[in-house]
């Protein structure tokens, strides 16, 4: 599968032990960042705000811009692609409420090997305590789970299919959920009901 191909490509990165990570630094990943009127972006900003204001954590938001990318476009009838605010690639912080949050947005069409390598290198250098991945289907966040603990926080009621070590789910697991977990090899003990 695509994930394993990329995982093999970046196999020289090693998992960073909890003791070597910066417990005051949290990275928040997303595949799409549009602004406060976009519900998933608002959810991300609220999480970033509370982690910074209530827990005094340093935050870096990374928009990998991977949601419904045009890279390797397949010519389907009426294909859809995600919106992207290109100007966000030129800024290094986002203002939200009464705080400034460091911000990085990929400016290339993803997935891009060099850009993924760049983001993996940022994670390796700064050693965040964990990565909170808002949404799902984020290849780069999944690859980063090989470096530090990654938490998936879906923006829908479905379980996020990811390589994260921790999966947040909004309701008790159903038989359908357990079947999906089995099919995707996600350990049910990795699910946190929130």
What is each model feature region?
Residues 29-33, 63-66, 107-110, 132-137, ...:
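Structural motif
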Residues 74-112:
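Conserved nucleotide-sugar phosphate-binding/catalytic loop shared by glycosyltransferases and other
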Residues 147-194:
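Active-site-proximal region of nucleotide-activated glycan assembly enzymes
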Residues 109-124:
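Alpha/beta-hydrolase active-site loop
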Residues 67-77, 140, 174-180:
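Short, charged/polar "capping" segments at the starts of alpha-helices
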Residues 50-61, 86-89, 96-99, 146, ...:
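Structural alpha-beta junctions
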Residues 121-137:
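Short N-terminal targeting/anchoring amphipathic segment
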């Amino acid at each position: 599968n695509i994930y394993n191909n990329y995982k093999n490509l970046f196999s020289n990165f090693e998992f960073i032990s909890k003791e070597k990570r910066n417990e005051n630094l949290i990275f928040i990943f997303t595949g799409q960042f549009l602004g406060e009127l976009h519900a998933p972006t608002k959810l991300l900003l609220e999480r970033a705000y509370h982690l910074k204001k209530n827990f005094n954590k340093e935050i870096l938001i990374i928009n990998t811009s991977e949601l419904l990318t045009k890279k390797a476009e397949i010519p389907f009838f009426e294909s859809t692609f995600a919106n992207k605010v290109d100007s966000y690639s030129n800024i290094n912080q986002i203002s939200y409420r009464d705080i400034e949050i460091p911000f990085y947005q990929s400016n290339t069409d993803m997935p891009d090997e060099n850009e993924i390598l760049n983001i993996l290198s940022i994670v390796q250098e700064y050693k965040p305590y964990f990565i909170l991945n808002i949404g799902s289907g984020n290849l780069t966040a999944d690859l980063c789970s090989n470096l530090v603990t990654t938490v998936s926080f879906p923006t829908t009621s479905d379980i996020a299919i990811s390589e994260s070590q921790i999966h947040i789910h909004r309701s008790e697991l159903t038989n359908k959920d357990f079947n999906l977990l089995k099919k995707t090899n996600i350990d049910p003990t990795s699910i946190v009901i929130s």
